[in-house]
């Protein structure tokens, strides 16, 4: 599971677009902590720190201890906004973590030992991934960093279902039969190209024969006219 990380913040007295712009001019981004049957708390966090955390991966599955002026709050990111052009973080929403609470999070799926899968290594198959993340409903302090899928021994035609994953009991929000990935046979590109070329050649030959027949028919008609 992900370790709790510390995040320094500053409490904000003012909210709104003007206040948010002022925060960003100071090298920070506005954020809010909500939930837990408490009033929302407006805060500001360092832009560089926020950008590093977001782009490092696993941001929305990490529990943070947010220290805003000595007031510490455990919370988990629920959403964030990025500038559509620059990708710079603009705002973050945090959900308070309280005892007995569960949260729904998307946990990444990592595939390991691909070089030990005969269907891929020896037979040239391809791993077709249907689910890059799985949605879990779990206690915040039990969120796994990632779900590993071992491909060792896998053959072409094998299908990996959600029921094959090692997940905390009762946490998966989908169906056990959901396909996570499967191993596809190699595509024979050369054969496809040859078949296409043969079809083109056949069509061209048919067109040539048709043109020749029309020319012969026209010549015969001209000959008959001259003899008449």
From Swiss-Prot:
It comes from the Bacteria. CDD domains: Ribosomal_L25_TL5_CTC. Residues 209-228 have a biased composition (Basic and acidic residues). Residues 196-228 are annotated as: Disordered. The keyword Protein transport does not apply. GO terms for biological process: translation. GO terms for cellular component: cytosolic large ribosomal subunit. This is one of the proteins that binds to the 5S RNA in the ribosome where it forms part of the central protuberance. Belongs to the bacterial ribosomal protein bL25 family. CTC subfamily. This is Large ribosomal subunit protein bL25. It comes from Methylorubrum extorquens (strain CM4 / NCIMB 13688).
């Amino acid at each position: 599971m992900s370790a709790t990380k510390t995040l320094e913040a500053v409490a904000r007295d003012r909210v709104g677009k003007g206040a948010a712009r002022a925060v960003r001019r100071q090298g920070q981004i506005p954020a809010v902590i909500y939930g837990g049957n408490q009033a929302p708390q407006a805060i500001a966090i360092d832009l560089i720190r926020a950008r590093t955390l977001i782009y490092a991966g696993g941001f929305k599955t990490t529990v943070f201890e947010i220290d805003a002026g000595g007031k510490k709050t455990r919370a988990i990111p629920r959403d964030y906004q990025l500038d559509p052009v620059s990708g710079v973080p603009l705002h973050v929403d945090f959900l308070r973590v309280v005892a007995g609470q569960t949260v729904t999070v998307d946990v990444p799926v990592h595939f390991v030992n691909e070089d030990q899968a005969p269907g891929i290594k020896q037979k040239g198959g391809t791993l077709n991934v249907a689910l890059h993340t799985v949605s879990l409903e779990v206690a915040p302090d039990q969120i796994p960093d990632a779900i590993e899928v071992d491909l060792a021994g896998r053959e072409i035609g094998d299908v990996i279902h959600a029921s094959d994953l090692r997940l905390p009991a009762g946490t998966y929000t989908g169906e056990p039969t959901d396909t996570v990935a499967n191993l596809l046979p190699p595509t024979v590109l050369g054969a496809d190209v040859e078949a296409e070329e043969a079809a083109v050649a056949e069509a061209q030959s048919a067109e040539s024969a048709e043109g020749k027949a029309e020319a012969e028919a026209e010549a015969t008609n001209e000959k008959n006219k001259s003899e008449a």
